[in-house]
């Protein structure tokens, strides 16, 4: 009985190592910026002024305009940075975007609302959450609560290429 916690810990460590190995190591030119064009539904990974990769993206369920308050379904616009990486996301993998910034907070506070938060670049949801999302997930390309979505395979590639601190410019 005393061995069970040790065995469980070993399984957890081995399992975590196996998950970490599924993310390939990127050895190309570093990504110096991410640029998102909301109207075109495109995201570009840049090295200086050269496009390294481009992806089609899904956005928040009400994508027109800048995110101002929690629950508005908009994807923010402006300059932010990647401030965290989540290998255990329910959306496969995810990269946190530093929304809200000082201006976002100031505006939301001025109208007595929350600006929201937890905006990410992420992959698709797991099946349980897809079913809960219903028709929007399956039939609408803009299905997130304000995040930027790509396929799981694309997210694996993006996750391996992006470091914390990478600037992201989200444009109309």
Where are these regions (language model features)?
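Exported/periplasmic cell-wall-interacting domains
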Residues: 84-172
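Sec/Tat signal peptide C-region and signal peptidase I cleavage site
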Residues: 16-20
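N-terminal post-signal-peptidase region of extra-cytosolic proteins
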Residues: 21-33, 59-83, 102-107, 152-153
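Positively charged n-region of N-terminal signal peptides that target proteins for export
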Residues: 1-4
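Short Gly/aromatic-enriched secondary-structure transition segments
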Residues: 50-62
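Bacterial N-terminal signal peptides
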Residues: 6-15
């Amino acid at each position: 009985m005393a061995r069970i916690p040790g065995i469980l810990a070993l399984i957890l460590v081995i399992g975590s190592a196996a998950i970490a190995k599924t993310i390939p190591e990127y050895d190309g030119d570093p990504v110096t910026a991410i640029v998102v064009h909301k109207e075109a539904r495109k995201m570009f990974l840049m090295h200086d002024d050269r496009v390294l990769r481009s992806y089609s993206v899904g956005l928040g369920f009400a994508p027109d305009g800048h995110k101002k308050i929690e629950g508005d379904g908009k994807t923010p616009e402006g300059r932010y940075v990647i401030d965290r990486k989540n290998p255990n996301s329910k959306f496969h993998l995810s990269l946190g975007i530093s929304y809200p910034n000082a201006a976002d907070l100031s505006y939301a506070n001025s109208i007595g609302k929350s600006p929201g938060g937890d905006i990410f670049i992420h992959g698709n949801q797991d099946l349980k959450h897809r079913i809960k999302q219903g028709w929007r997930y399956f039939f609408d390309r803009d299905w997130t609560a304000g995040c930027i979505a790509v396929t799981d395979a694309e997210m694996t590639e993006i996750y391996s290429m992006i470091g914390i601190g990478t600037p992201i410019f989200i444009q109309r």
